[in-house]
Design a protein with these regions (language model features):
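Conserved catalytic cores of very large enzyme subunits
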Residues: 1-391, 407, 411-412
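Contiguous, well-ordered alpha-helical segments that form the cores/surfaces of helical PPI scaffolds
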Residues: 394-407
Length: 412
């Protein structure tokens, strides 16, 4: 930031806290909302770091109590980092750590390592839950520079099936159900669960869940896809806490040809949204992606007004006509008005875009210097943002479709 640099966080609580600070700092340089495209993938390293720290501390404590050969904390920390790739208490990972400790001269029983592992896992889960609680509470209380609104935040998640990513998702959902004080439902962050065939969905899993839904809710069914149980938990959370919303990555317009389930960076090819409305994916000037991009401007069309004007004009043109003739004429007038208005809006948005390009990079120090906007990191402070914004979108929206139909047809 312009006030100093921040070191890489070393615990899940620090990861979550810095995520809120990033939201707030970025909010102060823009209008509207912002979104993290792969929250589970980004928070997962914090879970693993927390687990390794607890594993290190508990092993040191055990060796200190029992006496005998032990290692310096820095040595043991490095050993754990090298031999513990996951929080999952699988035989391979536990065996690797046990063998490495014995090779270093640390006398510790295999069963002791398993107990320590379970204890470190439980402690990490509790801290992850607290981190997600803090994340939610902070985003519903900390204000942006405007002072009259909390930071408008969104997080997308659902496709990280690593044990660490799954823990983040599960504890975020749990903290969302718990809510704020006095049972208040948290409004922020807006949450979007990404549903993907082979990751969190399959027809086989759906059939198994429907067959015995009570067992599915209780987590007593082993599903084929790794995150189908989290999809069920997400649906349960939505039923009581409004969020998450759901994004279906297999819809034809949401697919990316480069997405592969074995790619650790697959989240780069997943569409993400801001809130319940802003989808940025296709790109006229580069690869389609939601990363480092956003909506630059939007203008909404007032459909009821156009419909009312169309009915009045049609009535004047056919003063003695029946309602069907008037409606037919009004429909044509209305559709032509929509075309003309959309063209005018496009011209207005482009004119504004040309002005937006003249802004200087130093007006957005955090956003540009950290490459939050794709390409912003290459700019000097007094450079115009210019082509950095060409990856953004211009939005033509509308409001009142139902009311417009009532105005023309007398019914919705």
């Amino acid at each position: 930031t312009k006030n100093g640099s921040v070191r890489t966080p070393q615990s899940i609580q620090s990861y979550a806290t810095l995520a809120t600070i990033v939201f707030q700092t970025n909010q102060n340089e823009q209008h509207g909302g912002q979104s993290i495209p792969a929250f589970d993938h980004f928070m997962a390293p914090g879970v693993l770091k927390t687990f390794r720290r607890h594993l290190t501390d508990m092993t040191l404590f055990l060796c200190g109590v029992r006496g005998g050969v032990t290692l310096e904390r820095a040595e043991l920390k490095a050993l754990v980092a090298e031999h513990v790739p996951t929080i999952e208490p699988c035989e391979t990972a536990v065996g690797r750590l046990f063998a490495a400790l014995r090779q270093s001269g640390v006398e510790v029983a295999d069963e002791d390592i398993r107990r320590i592992w379970r204890q470190a896992y439980d402690t990490t889960r509790r801290e992850t839950h607290q981190a997600m609680e803090g994340f939610i509470h902070n985003l519903n209380t900390m204000h942006s520079r405007g002072g009259n609104q909390v930071v408008f935040s969104s997080v997308n998640y659902g496709t990280d099936f690593s044990p660490e990513g799954r823990m983040v998702i599960r504890e975020l959902l749990s903290a969302t159900i718990e809510g704020l004080g006095h049972g208040e439902v948290p409004v922020f962050p807006i949450q979007i669960f990404k549903v993907k065939e082979g990751v969190s969905w399959s027809e086989e899993d759906y059939a198994a869940a429907v067959k015995d839904f009570d067992k599915a809710l209780a987590g007593e069914i082993k599903f084929k896809t790794p995150n189908f149980d989290l999809l069920i938990e997400a649906c349960r959370t939505t039923s009581v806490a409004l969020f998450p919303n759901f994004m279906f990555l297999d819809a034809p317009f949401n697919r990316h040809e480069k997405w592969r389930i074995d790619d650790p960076d697959r989240f780069r090819y997943e569409v993400a949204t801001m809130g319940c409305r802003t989808r940025v994916f296709e790109n006229l000037h580069g690869e389609k992606s939601s990363w480092g991009r956003g909506n630059l401007s939007f203008t909404s069309m007032n459909l009821p007004r156009l419909a009312i004007e169309a009915m009045r004009e049609a009535g004047d043109m056919i003063p003695d006509g029946n309602k069907h003739a008037i409606r037919k004429e009004a429909r044509e007038i209305f559709l032509e008005s929509v075309r003309k208005t959309a063209t005018m809006m496009a011209e207005q948005l482009y004119e504004r875009y040309c002005f937006q390009r003249t802004a200087l990079a130093r007006q957005f120090p955090f956003m540009m210097s950290n490459d939050v906007w794709k390409g912003g990191g290459r700019l000097q402070p007094n450079d115009e943002v210019g082509d950095v914004l060409k990856h953004g979108t211009l939005g033509i929206g509308f409001i009142g479709g139902h009311n417009a139909m009532v105005a023309i047809y007398g019914e919705g």
